[in-house]
Amino acid sequence: MSSKRYKKLPEKTKELTADIIEKLIPKLKKNCTTKFNESLDLSIQINNKQKKSEINLRTIVNLPAGSGKKIKVAVVCEEGKSQIAKDAGADVVGADDFIEKIKSGELNFEKLICTPSMMIKLSKLGKILGPKGLMPNPKLGTVTDDLKKAVLNAKSGQAEIKNDKDGNIGLSLGKKSFTEDKIVQNFKAVLDTLEREKSNQPIKGDLIKSVFLTSTMGVSYKLKIPKNI
């Protein structure tokens, strides 16, 4: 970040009173003074340290307005299902031959989808795919026989919700070029997903402790959520 541009950004925004997203979006966009289309990102802290257990969330949210990113999707499936994946928009499709390429280190994709029957073979590559977050997972909808749905969802815009050991979750709501309505739609989808996840967890009190909204090269603002989750 250039020092000139940084000096022009507002200071101590994290200390300001939390505000609703509709009021923060214009402020955030005003601070997006770089030449590229910056991402508008959420930083969420959850109450994951419970007395009798530790909460670890891992799920996906389908962003109704999309993510603004072009995702390269790969599919491992039986030959008889390959055309379905291709027609849905998969960039790379293969079976045993593709698994061998992955084994040799060819990871030219950002999302990997696999059918249950092929997962037995693919699971042996956990040391390659796991550290990069590419291993398909039934909870994330990436181990499935419904390849059309999985590919379309991945292409249209999904975000993974996963907290670290300190309860932090980071994800993008879209781009600076998005309209306010699109950003709000995606934000509400994230809240709805977290609310559903909370109902499946042994949590006492609120799940969400704090939420901040920022841009790629900007500053953070504390976000007020419309309801306790």
Question: For each predicted feature, which ranges?
Answer:
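Translation machinery proteins
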Residues: 22, 26-83
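Flexible glycine-/small-residue-rich
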Residues: 46, 77, 116, 173-175, ...
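Glycine-rich phosphate-binding loops that contact phosphosugars or nucleotide phosphates
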Residues: 84-91
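Residue-level signature of catalytic and energy-coupling elements of molecular machines
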Residues: 24, 85, 130, 213
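Generic N-terminal amphipathic, Lys/Arg-enriched alpha-helix
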Residues: 1-14, 21
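Long, charge-patterned amphipathic alpha-helical coiled-coil/hairpin "stalk" segments used as oligomerization
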Residues: 91-197
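Flexible, glycine/charged-enriched surface loops at secondary-structure junctions
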Residues: 36-40, 197-210
